[in-house]
C-alpha cells in the first residue's frame, strides 16, 4: 500500500492498493474509491463493539478489499491534520479516543484505560484512550496542527490538558495540580496539567 495525504483544512489520505490488499476504516470515513473496491461492514464481535462505545469510535467498521489495483480515499471529519503512524509489535501507540480514521488490515485498535484514575478524572484526554497495535500503517485525524517531541528516558514535559494527541506506549501520563491559589484562580490556565514522561527501563 502506498499513500499520499492531500489538502490543508480538511485533508484526505489517498491509498493506492495492490490487488488483494485491504483497508479498514470507521463508518463514514471513505470519501471516494475505484469500483474495484469491495466493501464489507463488520462489528468484530460484541466485545469490540462495546470497546468502541467507550472509546468514542463508530460501532461498526468497513473493510475495503482491492479486487484489482486501485485507490481509495479517506477524509478527515473536521479541520486539522491526518497523521500516518507505523506500528509493529513492541511499537504500540496511544491516541486520542475517536482519532482513528483508517488502517491496513493487520493494525488493531483497543480500549486503553489510564491506570491512574486521577489522570482520567482531571486529565483533558480522559480516562479512556485508544491503543494502536499490530503491524502496518494507521491514519489518525487530529484537530488543529501538531508539534512532535521525542523524549529521552527520564525526560518529562508538562502539557496543558487536552493538547495531547498521541504518545508512544512507553510514555506515561500523570496529572499534577497547578501550584498556589493565586496561580489556580488568577493565572488564566487550567487547574490541572498533564505530565508526560518516559518509563525507566525495567
PLM region spans:
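Residue-level detector of conserved catalytic or cofactor/ligand-binding positions
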Residues: 194-202
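N-terminal, charged/glycine-rich beta-strand/loop interface patches
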Residues: 1-135, 142-147, 151-156, 160-174, ...
